[in-house]
Amino acid sequence: MIRRALVLLVRIYQRLVSPLLPPACRFYPSCSAYAVTALQRHGALRGSWLTVRRLCRCHPFHPGGVDPVPELTPKR
């Protein structure tokens, strides 16, 4: 339930806010696409943590590049 709400918030950002801003993300996939994938793959808690970590790295002094969402690791 929370995961869906967070994904919806990111989708709203992608549709309404992002088109008004110049492209600035230094990574592929974009930070918002990364957030959606992280939330869908890892759930609300870990997906949010991965998204915050990614957003903290997205600044002019970081080289950027390809940064995919980590795969799920099986529980032992």
UniProtKB/Swiss-Prot annotation:
It is a peripheral membrane protein. InterPro entries: Membr_insert_effic_factor_YidD. It is found in: Cell inner membrane. Its main location: membrane. It comes from the Bacteria. GO terms for cellular component: plasma membrane. Keywords: Cell inner membrane, Cell membrane, Membrane. Belongs to the UPF0161 family. NCBIfam families: membrane protein insertion efficiency factor YidD. Could be involved in insertion of integral membrane proteins into the membrane. HAMAP family: UPF0161_YidD. This is Putative membrane protein insertion efficiency factor. It comes from Anaeromyxobacter dehalogenans (strain 2CP-C).
